[in-house]
Curated annotation (Swiss-Prot):
InterPro entries: Beta-propeller_rpt_TECPR, Ricin_B-like_lectins, Tectonin_beta-propeller. It is found in: Cell surface; Cytoplasmic vesicle membrane. The keyword Transmembrane helix does not apply. Residues 138-353 are annotated as: 6 X approximate tandem repeats. One of its GO terms (cellular component) is cell surface. The keyword Endoplasmic reticulum does not apply. This is Tectonin-2. Coiled coil: none annotated. It holds the Pfam family Tectonin.
Length: 353
């Protein structure tokens, strides 16, 4: 039997998927606060057959209420290796749990804290070993390769970067692939949208099917992609722009920044030449305490940055900066808390927030 794991919502890593206290069959599962002293009903086993079993009772498995081909709640039931097994079997892809019946659906959590089947990427949950919750963030590990800029998409299988020679690379979870083209800055969204800029300030977006770049009107020195509908950038004059997909043009945003970042949920932060930090409220910029030279936003709950000394920080509760270990010149965070960074020597590091 596999090692027990927690099932965690990345945007709320202090909560885990749990059952009702009596572990009742057909009882709904919910999101509960993480407490290392309370594990019964909160630890799960993903076995070799594809069942997600309750660690406290291996006879109970996570099931889909009414089928797996639509959104719906999850419940506990007894494993059925005949008629209903297709609703009880799961596929683990990069620690994300998809239904075997239809892998476009995955396990997630709705706004009420109920564990559901969904296609919404921002709601999906991931597997985490107990040790990874007890020590968060995890220690930085050296990763192969050299980069100046790094970006994280849907997880550790979709990481992009550029090096000091302006070469573009994509990490697919097992190795780096050099991508045709040259860039000085690159960004990838949760939905896999990739944009970059080169030293001539030209802007390009990638066709993921052909790995070919197409030019985008405008000039930028830095671009940030939350998803295909949330793209921001700054130019060499520190002017700020937001992409309008409907008109295929840029909309000027008042203010001056040297670095801007947008999450898949539309959350936007930026820093200026003085190192001041700002949060966009939809109409104007609100000052945020602290000083940074680079900032990265996955969503409103996952925001990291580095200052001019190379110190790494994460924003907690939208106002308090927590210093993390390590010294980097660039940092990025994925929707699942995947931390990637590069230092002044171009060395690459990764961790888990």
């Amino acid at each position: 039997m596999a090692t027990p794991v927690y099932i965690v919502l990345p945007s709320r890593p202090d909560h885990v998927v749990s059952t009702a206290k009596d572990h009742a069959v057909q009882g709904y599962t919910e999101l509960h606060p993480y407490d290392p002293s309370q594990t019964e009903g909160r630890l799960w086993i993903f076995d070799n057959d594809g069942y997600i079993r309750l660690a406290a009772n291996h006879n109970l498995v996570l099931d889909v209420n009414g089928g797996a081909a639509k959104e719906g709640n999850t419940v506990l039931s007894y494993p059925d290796k005949k008629d209903h097994a297709k609703n009880q079997l799961w596929v683990n892809k990069d620690c994300i749990l998809h239904t075997k019946l239809d892998e476009s659906f995955h396990l997630g959590v709705n706004d009420k804290g109920q564990v559901i089947i969904t296609q919404k990427k921002e709601q999906r949950v991931i597997l985490r070993a107990p040790a990874s919750l007890e020590k968060r963030p995890s220690a930085w590990e050296r990763h192969e390769g050299e980069l100046n800029v790094v970006a994280v998409g849907a997880g550790n299988h979709d990481v992009w970067g550029v090096n000091h020679l302006e070469h573009i690379y994509h990490w697919d979870g097992s190795k780096w692939h050099q991508i045709e083209g040259a860039a000085t800055n690159i960004s990838v969204g949760l939905d896999g949208t990739v944009w970059c800029v080169n030293k001539a300030h030209e802007i390009y977006r990638l066709d993921r099917g052909t790995n070919k770049w197409s030019i985008v009107p405008g000039e930028l020195v830095q671009v940030s992609v939350g998803n295909s509908h949330n793209i921001w950038g700054v130019n060499h004059l520190d002017a700020i722009y937001k992409w309008n997909a409907d008109s295929n043009s840029w909309t000027f945003v008042d203010g001056q920044l040297t670095n801007v970042s947008v999450g898949h949920d539309g959350t936007v932060y930026g820093v200026n030449r003085a190192g001041n930090i700002y949060h966009y409220n939809g109409n104007s910029w609100d000052a945020v305490s602290g000083e940074l030279v680079q900032i990265h936003v996955a969503n409103k709950d996952l925001i990291v940055g580095v200052n001019k000394a190379g110190h790494v920080y994460r924003l907690k509760h939208g106002k308090d900066w927590e210093k993390l270990e390590g010294e980097l010149s660039w940092v990025a965070v994925g929707h699942g808390g995947e931390l990637w960074g590069a230092n002044s020597a171009h060395n690459i590091y990764k961790a888990l927030l």
